[in-house]
Amino acid sequence: LVGSEMCIRDRINGQGNFGSIDGDSAAAMRYTEIRLQKITAEILSDLDKQTVDFAPNYDNNEQEPIVLPSKVPVLLINGSSGIAVGMATNIPPHNLGEVIDASLALLDNENLSVQDLMEFVLAPDFPTGGIIYGLEEVKAGYLTGRGRVVMRGKVHTEILKHRGAEREAIIIDELPYQVNKAKLVEKIGILVREKSLEGIADLRDESDKSGIRVVIELKRHENAEVIINQLYKLTPLQDSFGMNMIALVDGYPKQL
């Protein structure tokens, strides 16, 4: 439940403490609840009109739909991850508008190739933002079912006033998907103390309800681009997501 709320907040609306990007634990189940957003009703639309087949549930007391009659491709939009005996799946989330555009194009021309559909859906769309670095392995993921998404945090530089003097700073605005912000800041601090990462005068987390803001103040005459590249190389500010597009098709697992 917590994982769903953190990933797909535009489809569901959680009430209560669902944890944080710093790794804080969520509240106990009895203190959290979720309601569907308006668009999520389209996943259940026309369920009462015999649009999908029903089968007995686990104890044969009720009938349940084999699949939901969704008007949108939920699996691609939400993404999915899980482990079973001898197999695993790891499907990244995608942009709602892009997937719907691709779906409409496929309805108009069912012979469209994966390459054609990638004109509408270039890459995954992760809820924490960030930048996707390179598309070749993403294309491989779409074409073969296996690939890798290299993600980078989004940064910019600012000139800050410090005791009457100006000092350049690197500001981290967005993080790669599933990266813990507190552990990232801790990792940067360790590298600075060990002198594996030099040129940093101060490090602080100014994040609040308005968004992420990690400030890395530089020493005088340091090159911000060089330090940014070191951050990508040495810390989780650059991370990857392994694509393994396995889903159940007609009741059997299939590499998509």
Where are these regions (language model features)?
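Eukaryotic nuclear low-complexity, Arg/Ser/Gly/Pro-rich intrinsically disordered regions
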Residues: 144-160
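Generic preference for hydrophobic/aromatic residues in regular secondary structure cores
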Residues: 6, 54, 155-157, 200
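Feature marking long nucleic-acid-engaging regions of large polymerase/nuclease enzymes
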Residues: 69-108, 157-185, 189-256
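Catalytic phosphate-handling regions of large nucleic-acid enzymes and associated NTPases
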Residues: 3-148, 213-215
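Hydrophobic/aromatic pocket-lining and membrane-interface residues
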Residues: 2-3, 231
